[in-house]
Amino acid sequence: TAQEAHVEALRVDSETAKRKAEEAVKAARAAREAASAAKAELDKLAADQTAQAAAVQNELAGQKQREAEMQAESDRLTAVLRERAEAARRAAAAAAAAAGGGGGTPQGGDGYMLWPLPGGWVTSEYGSRVDPINGVGGFHPGLDIANPCGNPVIAALSGTVVSAGAAGGYGNRVVLDHGIQRGVPVATSYNHMQSIAVWGGQVSRGQVIGYEGTTGWSNGCHLHFEVFVNGGTVNPRGWL
């Protein structure tokens, strides 16, 4: 009958509306879940970026602190060596005056140094360079000489051990005072060593004073070798 047909049509419309409503609810739920997942992903990305930025800042702060510590140690050593250099000049002048030399400074040996890491090769020269660790430009006050870790490091000249031990960013270090050489007070330092073989007293030219390593602020096995004249660094090439 017409009434039954009308009722059936209403039922179909109701079921269709219900199904569409359920589908709309499911779609809304899926959209909420997708939005929640997207927000979680964005939150995670933001947290990761914040953590990475903090890590970079911490690394930069650490590098600046290491640089400051190494500069302070360099300044301290320079002051010590300048004081020793002045004492050596006074002693040489007094000795020359006593010998009737009119106060001149004597020549101390031939002045040429042995290669401090036999068989090693230079990987970084004295002077301006970009630091291989932090990529920042600066001044390199010595020669970097490379060889496999564990190779012997020798005294470039005979001298007196000024200091031996850990020296912050310089790693395990030995500093030698060679007195007057070629008319000027000379000292040398040997840095980043794996281990040290002398702790005080006198050493002879060519004597093993330690073994090459990569201690301190270093990016690989090498010897950082410095030559000091009158307490300040000079290019070791002029002495080797």
Residue locations for each model-derived region?
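Alpha-helical oligomerization segments with coiled-coil/rod-like character
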Residues: 1-106
